[in-house]
UniProtKB/Swiss-Prot annotation:
The enzyme has great affinity for glucose and mannose. Homodimer. Its EC number is 2.7.1.2, 2.7.1.7. Keywords: ATP-binding, Glycolysis, Kinase, Multifunctional enzyme, Nucleotide-binding, Transferase. This is Glucomannokinase. Competitively inhibited by 2-deoxy-glucose. It comes from Segatella bryantii (Prevotella bryantii). It is an enzyme of class 2 (transferase). GO terms for molecular function: ATP binding; glucokinase activity; mannokinase activity. The keyword ATP-binding applies. Belongs to the ROK (NagC/XylR) family. GO terms for biological process: glycolytic process; mannose metabolic process. Pathway: Carbohydrate degradation; glycolysis; D-glyceraldehyde 3-phosphate and glycerone phosphate from D-glucose: step 1/4; Carbohydrate metabolism; mannose metabolism.
Length: 25
């Protein structure tokens, strides 16, 4: 989950739905 802190927008786009909200934030 360290990557989410460094680049949450990438994680959100990666899932393309589940973490879309986190990606925007």
């Amino acid at each position: 989950m360290n990557e989410q802190s460094m680049k949450p927008y990438v994680i959100g786009l990666d899932l393309g739905g589940t973490n879309s909200v986190f990606g925007i934030v």
